[in-house]
């Protein structure tokens, strides 16, 4: 199998007994990218891999260099049985919070799959609450379970590409390099030029800049 675990002990009630991965044929891994960014959507990916065509080298996307990650991304989208993306945009993030937006993006990613999985493995300790499909959450699942690693790679590469496009529209903030995360340069430019429409106004660094601007009016 493509998963790194063959047996998973379930602690919650989603699946009442010890979860034997082998009895499920269509296993989807789900992960997200962009929770800590100050800019843009949070993006989730859902991936179903062929059990007889394992992809070697899968790992947490954050631990891979750019070239390795991109090569794996191409391999996954070429050879996966199914894969999809789900977005939660800036308005949805600011309206609720990043944790709820993360779950919403995950739910959309699974919904967008062209093939319905019979098991979902999710990175983290919270689930959107799938009612028709058994699921299980795993802390650091992107580093422990290959199918979740695959989802983490799809989500990160997709979001990085979106940030490169945004950088071309707003080159002052360095989005192509920092991907919207609060680097020194990004925060400096944010304070100097103010936020754009894609900045998450509910996030403290952006909220602080907006407050400073309003005080000066």
UniProtKB/Swiss-Prot annotation:
Alphabetical GO biological process terms:
DNA replication, removal of RNA primer; mismatch repair
- Enumerate the GO terms in the molecular function aspect: manganese ion binding; RNA binding; RNA-DNA hybrid ribonuclease activity
The protein's Enzyme Commission number: 3.1.26.4
Q: Does Kinase appear among the keywords?
A: no
List the keywords (alphabetical).
Answer: Cytoplasm, Endonuclease, Hydrolase, Manganese, Metal-binding, Nuclease
Q: Which domain of life is it from?
A: Bacteria
**Cofactor binding, note field:** Manganese or magnesium. Binds 1 divalent metal ion per monomer in the absence of substrate. May bind a second metal ion after substrate binding.
Residues of the signal peptide: none
Q: Name one GO cellular component term.
A: cytoplasm
Q: Which Pfam families does the entry mention?
A: RNase_HII (PF01351)
Q: Which residues form the RNase H type-2 domain?
A: 25-215
- Ranges that cross the membrane: none
Q: Which cofactor does it need?
A: Mn(2+); Mg(2+)
Functionally, this protein is described as follows:
Endonuclease that specifically degrades the RNA of RNA-DNA hybrids.
What does the sequence similarity comment in the record state about its family? Belongs to the RNase HII family.
Q: What is this protein called?
A: Ribonuclease HII
Q: Which organism is it from?
A: Blochmanniella pennsylvanica (strain BPEN)
């Amino acid at each position: 199998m493509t998963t790194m675990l063959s047996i998973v002990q379930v602690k919650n009630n989603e699946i009442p007994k010890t979860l034997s991965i082998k009895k499920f044929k269509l296993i989807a891994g789900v992960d997200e990218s962009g929770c800590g960014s100050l800019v843009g959507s949070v993006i989730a990916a859902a991936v179903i891999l062929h059990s007889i065509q394992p992809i070697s080298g899968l790992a947490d996307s954050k631990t891979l260099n750019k070239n390795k990650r991109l090569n794996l991304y191409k391999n996954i989208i070429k050879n996966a049985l199914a894969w999809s993306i789900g977005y939660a945009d800036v308005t949805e993030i600011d309206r609720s919070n990043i944790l709820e937006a993360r779950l919403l993006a995950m739910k959309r990613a699974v919904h967008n799959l062209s093939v319905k999985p019979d098991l979902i493995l999710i990175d983290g300790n919270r689930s959107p609450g799938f009612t028709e499909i058994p699921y299980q959450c795993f802390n650091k699942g992107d580093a422990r379970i290959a199918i979740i690693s695959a989802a983490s790679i799809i989500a990160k590469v997709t979001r990085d590409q979106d940030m490169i496009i945004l950088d071309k529209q707003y080159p002052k903030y360095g989005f192509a390099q920092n991907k919207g995360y609060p680097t020194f340069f990004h925060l400096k430019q944010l304070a100097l030029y103010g936020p754009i429409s894609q900045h998450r106004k509910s996030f403290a660094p952006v909220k602080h800049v907006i407050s400073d601007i309003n005080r000066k009016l």
